[in-house]
Amino acid sequence: MSSRTGHEKGRRTSQSKTGHFKRSGKPNRVEDQTTRRHPTRTAKAKAKAKANKPRVDLQNRKVIIFNKPYDTLSQFTDGDGRKTLADYIPVKDVYAAGRLDRDSEGLMVLTNDGILQAKLTQPKSKSPKTYWVQVDGAPQEQDLEKLRKGVELKDGMTLPAKVEVIDAPTIWERNPPVRFRANIPTTWLAITIIEGRNRQVRRMTAHIGFPTLRLVRYSMGDITLGDLQPGQWKEIQL
């Protein structure tokens, strides 16, 4: 899947795996009260929101995949002079389907198709997202099992994740390098989730006692990072 490319500096390539999970969740109190008092109003609001998502025919649809470098914002503008998507991607009228933290790296999908955007980001679509995560320390199976069952964060219980220990992926070196503690080992994990809460994966690994040192998103649904290097982008056909 390829056509147009754009590039900056980068070094090596990558591979990994994906997974899928069951959906569950709790409405917050305000949403619950609104549903009880005005069920038809809530249904109308949902229908209106769905109708407002731009539908684009296949001939006009744009889908960009991008390897976001470390220390780059997942947006096109910034008033403080920090690096943004605009420093790398000249394509107009495309929007990110899910963000990455400034200190995270890897796959971003940008599109002008609101339906595709929702499919990749909304938990109800059960679209898996796989991250390669380097953690401080050496988690054991009983630690990883907690993530597989779900952990309680400040914003609620996480859905079950697919988690496995992997060999260190053959990818580019981060700039700046990750800071290691000489006497503490590090471990690479492949973590697959269907949610997208703020800094969720980092909070999950911290919750079980193994802080994230480096986080690289490898895939979203069936879309993978492939051999894109940091700062490179490519327009694809789905």
Curated annotation (Swiss-Prot):
Region (Disordered): 1-54
PROSITE patterns: PSI_RSU (PS01149)
EC number: 5.4.99.20
Disulfide bonds listed in the record: none
Keywords for this protein: Isomerase, rRNA processing
Gene Ontology molecular function terms on file: 23S rRNA pseudouridine(2457) synthase activity; RNA binding
Active site residues of this protein: D101
Example GO biological process: pseudouridine synthesis
UniProt biased composition (Basic residues): 9-26, 36-53
Domain of life, source organism: Bacteria
Pfam families per UniProt: PseudoU_synth_2 (PF00849)
Matching SUPFAM superfamilies: Pseudouridine synthase
Reactions performed catalytically: uridine(2457) in 23S rRNA = pseudouridine(2457) in 23S rRNA
Family the entry assigns: Belongs to the pseudouridine synthase RsuA family.
Function: Responsible for synthesis of pseudouridine from uracil-2457 in 23S ribosomal RNA.
UniProt-recorded name of the protein: Ribosomal large subunit pseudouridine synthase E
Originating species: Vibrio parahaemolyticus serotype O3:K6 (strain RIMD 2210633)
Lineage: Bacteria, Pseudomonadati, Pseudomonadota, Gammaproteobacteria, Vibrionales
Name of encoding gene: rluE
